[in-house]
Swiss-Prot record:
This protein's encoding gene: hspbap1
GO (cellular component) term, any one: cytoplasm
InterPro entries: Cupin_8 (IPR041667), JmjC_dom (IPR003347)
Compositionally biased spans, kind Basic and acidic residues: 385-395
SUPFAM superfamilies in the cross-refs: Clavaminate synthase-like
One annotated GO molecular function: 2-oxoglutarate-dependent dioxygenase activity
Lineage: Eukaryota, Metazoa, Chordata, Craniata, Vertebrata
Location of the JmjC domain: 102-266
Organism, as annotated: Danio rerio (Zebrafish)
Main location: cytoplasm
Protein name: HSPB1-associated protein 1 homolog
Disulfide bonds: none
Subcellular location: Cytoplasm
Length: 449
């Protein structure tokens, strides 16, 4: 086994302590998964998988997964499509020219893809990061073309380790404290994902003026590198090179117990509101990654179960602590002694911090398939504009539109219209859900103490 810059214990401590994104170097030099290029995978996996297809666009609105097309194809067929250079299109990608569209096989669980080749699970060695037993079975595979992207979002559970295998990916990250600047939305609804209304590559600052205050961290992840994404950091990811392959694993945390209560509450509200028939409630609100709409009874059962598990876990944690000491946790949610000294992380050639970018810059370099227009005159917004936007209270999402705006009422006179989605945006806003979750937990503790 080759020498690593960090022992598993050191790597795990770094992951537990770090509160900002960072890149590990030279930790995967002996991982067999380094050879998981798209050519290698095409020989290992012959069954068809689903690719999300989107048009290369300069729109200011984000392209959500509900607005994409989907193609069932083998990786070999995908490879042939990416290699097409003006030849007549054939196969599953017949309707999509590779110069006009991108394709992304995302969120593919390796345990399902290679269930008949379990030996491949060992190719991904997360135990090197201090998580023994974690391998490909606990990971997802991502295969995409240039410009393939994931809409800006945050993950409700855990932290994230991302191993880049082939090609480069550009990551745009924002800290949890900047959530208000990213205009969070739960439509389209996906369990454990909070999306942003903002296209962070081409932001519309007239609709989303607060985004101008968001703190942007950027990094281009190279093959062999591993990116650490802390809990609840927003991220938008796009493929830079013609073909990219990466593998990630979400690392569970004790704090996920309460997050599951919040997610169960969110799902209950979203399903209840969006399942109600109304004239403005016919949009595609459920993400294609979801199996279907569960009933209100099912959602309430899951909410009760999540609350019960969380309460039992908190009760066990408190009982395990000496009575004279307060219960404290480190960043990963693990209980620690109040006397424990703070741990510091030393950056160097094998651990590089992801740096803050002062402001989004216009870019037309080869490293980016899109560009940000925040410096152009039409994207500038004055203080007067900001005051008007605030007074207009333009927030939320109308059916088929990204923000509330003046519209014609049935009688023909122009007036402001509040839609079902506008109300829902407020009800399931992360701040509101966090408050209601705390109220539920406090009330249940009172009833069962």
């Amino acid at each position: 086994m080759s020498s690593k810059p960090f022992t598993p214990e050191e790597a795990r401590r770094i992951v537990q302590v770090l509160q900002k994104p960072a890149v590990f170097l030279n930790m995967t030099t002996d991982w067999p998964a380094l050879h998981w290029t798209v050519e290698h995978l095409s020989a290992c996996l012959t069954k068809r998988i689903r690719f999300r297809v989107g048009k290369r666009s300069e729109d200011m609105a984000p392209l959500f997964e509900t607005e994409c097309s989907y193609v069932e194809a083998t990786i070999k067929e995908f490879l042939s499509w990416t290699a097409n250079d003006g030849e007549p299109l054939v196969g599953p990608f017949l309707d999509y020219h590779c110069k006009e569209f991108w394709a992304y096989a995302d969120y593919k669980y390796i345990a399902q893809l290679f269930q008949d080749k379990p030996a491949m699970f060992q190719d991904v060695v997360w135990s090197d990061f201090g998580f023994p037993g974690r391998d490909g079975r606990d990971s997802t595979l991502w295969i995409g073309t240039q410009c393939a992207n994931t809409p800006c979002h945050l993950d409700s559970y855990g932290c994230n380790l991302v191993f880049q295998i082939q090609g480069r990916k550009r990551w745009h990250l924002f800290p949890p404290d900047d959530t208000a600047c990213l205009y969070p939305t739960r439509v389209p609804y996906e369990e454990s994902s909070v999306f942003s209304h903002v296209n962070v590559i081409r932001p519309d600052l007239k609709k989303f003026p607060a985004y101008g205050r968001a703190r942007l961290y950027t990094v281009t992840l190279q093959p062999g590198q591993v990116l650490f994404v802390p809990r609840h950091w927003w991220h938008y990811v796009e493929s830079v090179d013609p073909v990219t392959v990466s593998v990630n694993s979400w690392i569970e945390m004790d704090m996920d117990d309460e997050a599951r209560v919040a997610e169960a509450l969110t799902k209950t509200i979203v399903c209840a509101v969006k399942s109600s028939p109304s004239l403005d409630n016919s949009d595609q609100w459920l993400n294609p990654t979801e199996d279907g709409v569960s009933s209100h009874d099912e959602n309430m059962q899951y909410l009760n179960l999540a609350v019960k598990v969380c309460m039992n876990k908190k009760r066990d944690d408190i009982e395990d602590q000496p009575k004279a000491e307060a219960v404290k946790r480190d960043f990963s949610g693990v209980l620690k002694s109040p006397a424990s000294p703070p741990s510091l992380v030393s950056f160097g050639p094998h651990l590089i911090p992801v740096h803050l970018t002062e402001k989004p810059q216009c870019s037309s370099t080869k490293d980016s398939c899109c560009f940000s227009c925040t410096d152009s005159p039409q994207c500038q917004i004055t203080t007067k504009d900001q005051d008007k936007l605030r007074s207009d209270n333009k927030l939320g999402q109308r059916s088929g539109q990204s923000v509330l705006q003046d519209t014609e009422n049935p009688g023909g006179s122009g007036e402001m219209h509040i839609s079902t989605n506008d109300v829902l945006e407020c009800l399931v806003h992360p701040d509101v859900i966090a408050l209601v979750t705390r109220l539920i937990m406090c009330r249940q503790r009172e009833l069962h103490s």
